[in-house]
Amino acid sequence: MPGGGPRGTYAREEAPGMKILCAIDGSRHSQWALDWLPHVCSPDDCSLLLVHAVDMAQFKSLSKLDRKTRLAMVNLLECSLEGAARLLEGAELRASTSWDSIRAKLLRGHPAEAVVRSAKREQADLLVIGSRGVTEFQPMLLGSVSRKLLMQAPCPVLVVKKPMTGLKRVVLGADGSIESWEAIAWLTRLPEHSRPSVTVASVIPPLPKESLRLPSRALAVGNQVEGVLRREAKKLAARAAGTLRKAGWSAKGIVLSGPPGAELITLAGRERANLIIVGSRSRRSAHEYFMGSVADTVVKHAPCSVLVYRN
């Protein structure tokens, strides 16, 4: 690596507990991501890997260029690698005030693909990314990099959208899935100093009764179904909140009605939440994920950071 590489302190097999991979791109959002880390995992029980990817695709056809252009491209490549090394070293220095088990690694390849490969290879338990790239001109989540990360990551993804001012209030969307129960278990493992109050929300999606102009008998059946769904949602929210309270947390369960993503976002604004947690089941294709996922809606429009919990 030109200019030397990040120092890296621990081999993977020596690192304890939870394995966190944090993608660094030089933006203020990735700096905020570093500040979030001690609040989601005790540095004594976790290892941290900082990664930055340099896309080498633009340098693959150097042999086809004239000598002057080729030399300029080689110089650009060296500068890119040196800049990436400095970026990682700075991030490692910033994180070292809280963490002992840190490594930093420069990846080569398309950023999303390289980060996903690294997360799989390292068997990461959590991937942390900033919500905007370096340019700030558009949300990172509208681009292909973060789309691929959210779709293909082999672990939960924490999307940092705001600076860390203390993890005080969390909104958790409970739908009875394995992912939402595992998210609750994840919450109970947060460090002692990061024990926020939790609002567990079970959301009943709207039934299309009015739009279909159903006859009165069908409307009555629809109302009965809605009543059953509400009772089940109430049980689910109460059970989830009870699980957290048994673990020593301050938690309450509520039932909401409406589009789940929009309801969770509104609730987070009302509660002034620092974090929304939603589950995301595996999808067969990118189209399915991004054309209707509750997690996608929440990540795009939430007023706070979001943890997308994947099994």
Language model region names:
Residues G130-S131, P156-K162, V306-R310:
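Short beta-strand elements of ligand-binding domains
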Residues R70-R86, A220-K235:
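A short acidic, glycine-rich active-site loop
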Residues L126-K148, L167, L275-H301, N311:
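Glycine-rich, Arg-bearing micro-motifs that act as flexible, cationic patches
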Residues G8-L71, S96, D100-I102, R169-N223, ...:
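Small/aliphatic-rich secondary-structure junction motif
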Residues P2-P16, H29, Q58, L71-E78, ...:
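Structural beta-alpha unit
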